[in-house]
């Protein structure tokens, strides 16, 4: 952060928010390739890419930008990328990475100045991702309906540019952003129905992540504004929001727009018990009210996306589910609030009678169907979930094959340790263990019986997690304490780092 402050003060761009001249500074591209500053941990497939981003390449890029960038924008040329020259892919990626660093500077400086100037206000609306787990345990069982939402991606580059205008007043940076979206990143290929927009694009994940977060923040900003206006509740989280350009003017504009466009539905949202939780592109809106209110919220979200963001929302992106009858898939868990009938015997005078009390219990299950589909794609089992061998790993050593299976099995056990129903997890672990044995048997051209007899019981202990292995050493496997701890529900806060287990359509990445 101090580096950014020094650079901005030296060039004198902090007061006027002019970011475009920073594009011609060599240190910007050095910062773009500084892995200590790059929190997104970009992994490039081309191992020699960092060697190409030398000082000479940056100087040559700066010279080309000085000489020809304006000609590329205004000249009537059939090749819009001619100014980049023969190193089109290299220079375009260098420019986009440098631009990604530049656009993050205002947000970092404003947040730092806010934290240094005053204490952080307590927020009940915006909390850490780790607060999802206590929310499920404490509040989820008391709610009735949930709105399962897939946030649509912006399909028009101009919408992202308009969103960015609220943060930066530099017109040149806005033109450059528009130029990147239209020319370099082949926007049309990103919005085809068969391909979803990957915010972690291999070309520049940091840049696309920034654009995606800007879009989601704009969506949630309007959502919470109307939420607070409709319920007549004072917002307790406005202090922790990033400062905007013309913030109050934007709020007044929203009041005018939604008073005209949504005046017929604004009065409908008066439920003070709505809970909003989001992780990446999926969000849930849970409430204790009637399904009529949830239908009104659904109608509001669809109109917001279509009229304000110009995004056509498919009907399947918003579902209304009853928590007692249906499960929702969130963070890789199938969660629902099941009704349990508890019979309590009471005695008054000499007459005994039974009182039935209905209690709600929060349950989380392993998405067994999705996991088996992913195992089938990775060739660990057939569609009927029968384990098969992994012939592509036959060239590896025995220890390497076992370690790969053990790592997959431990990741699954660690991630789904918060599940209350682990029968599906036991089945997945069984498939992986048997698939490992069959892979080794096929490699050595032996039989399963002979191979297991040679390995012994220690082979299956390798598939236990470190926590399970430690508990097994303290308590006997046959004891009640071992069974209770082994089947207990534990939320590990580091499971959010296992991103592939959240979206099961990309789960095959874990099984490679």
From Swiss-Prot:
Superkingdom, natural source: Eukaryota
Keywords, alphabetical: Chloroplast, mRNA processing, Plastid, RNA-binding, tRNA processing
Protein family according to the UniProt entry: Belongs to the intron maturase 2 family. MatK subfamily.
UniProt-annotated location(s): Plastid, Chloroplast
One GO-annotated biological process of the protein: tRNA processing
GO molecular function: RNA binding
Organism for this UniProt entry: Koelreuteria paniculata
Cellular component GO terms, alphabetical: chloroplast
UniProt gene name: matK
Protein name: Maturase K
């Amino acid at each position: 952060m101090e580096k950014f402050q020094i650079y901005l003060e030296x060039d004198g761009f902090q007061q006027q928010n002019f970011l475009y001249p920073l594009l011609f500074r060599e240190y910007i591209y050095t910062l773009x390739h500084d892995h200590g500053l790059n929190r997104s941990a970009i992994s490039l497939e081309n191992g020699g890419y960092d060697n190409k981003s030398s000082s000479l390449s940056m100087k040559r890029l700066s010279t080309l930008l000085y000489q020809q960038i304006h000609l590329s924008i205004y000249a009537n040329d059939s090749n819009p990328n001619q100014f980049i020259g023969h190193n089109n892919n290299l220079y375009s990626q260098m420019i986009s990475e440098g631009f990604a660093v530049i656009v993050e500077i205002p947000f970092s400086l404003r947040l730092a100045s806010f934290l240094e100037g005053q204490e952080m206000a307590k927020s009940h609306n915006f909390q850490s991702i780790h607060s999802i787990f206590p929310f499920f345990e404490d509040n989820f069982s008391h709610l009735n309906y949930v709105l399962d939402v897939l946030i649509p991606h912006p399909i028009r580059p101009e919408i992202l540019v308009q969103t960015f205008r609220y943060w930066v007043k530099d017109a040149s940076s806005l033109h450059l952003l528009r130029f990147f979206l239209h020319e370099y990143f082949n926007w049309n290929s990103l919005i085809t129905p068969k391909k979803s927009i990957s915010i972690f694009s291999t070309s520049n994940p940091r840049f696309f992540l920034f654009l995606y977060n800007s879009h989601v923040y704009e969506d949630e900003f309007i959502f919470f504004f109307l939420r607070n206006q409709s319920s007549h509740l004072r917002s307790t989280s406005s202090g922790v929001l990033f400062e905007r350009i013309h913030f109050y003017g934007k709020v007044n504009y929203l009041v005018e727009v939604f008073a005209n466009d949504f005046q017929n539905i604004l009065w409908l949202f008066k439920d003070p018990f709505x809970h909003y939780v989001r992780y990446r592109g999926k969000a849930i809106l849970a409430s204790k009210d009637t399904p009529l209110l949830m239908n009104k919220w659904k109608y509001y979200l669809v109109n917001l996306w279509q009229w304000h963001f110009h995004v056509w929302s498919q009907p399947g992106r918003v579902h209304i589910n009853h928590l007692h009858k249906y499960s929702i898939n969130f963070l890789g868990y199938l969660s629902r609030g099941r009704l349990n009938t508890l019979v309590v015997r009471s005695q008054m005078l000499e007459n005994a009678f039974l009182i039935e009390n209905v209690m709600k219990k929060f349950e989380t299950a392993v998405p067994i169907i999705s996991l088996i589909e992913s195992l089938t794609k990775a060739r660990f089992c057939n569609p009927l979930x029968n384990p098969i061998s992994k012939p592509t790993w036959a060239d590896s050593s025995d220890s390497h094959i076992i370690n790969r299976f053990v790592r997959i099995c431990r990741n699954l056990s660690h991630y789904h340790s918060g599940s209350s129903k682990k029968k599906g997890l036991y089945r997945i672990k069984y498939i992986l263990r048997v698939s490992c044995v069959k892979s080794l048997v096929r490699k050595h051209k032996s039989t399963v019986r002979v191979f297991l007899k040679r390995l012994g019981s220690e082979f299956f202990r390798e598939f236990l997690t470190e926590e399970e292995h430690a508990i097994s050493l303290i308590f006997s496997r046959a004891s009640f304490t071992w069974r209770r701890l082994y089947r207990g529900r534990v939320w590990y806060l580091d499971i959010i780092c296992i991103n592939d287990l959240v979206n099961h359509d990309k789960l095959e990445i874990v099984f490679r």
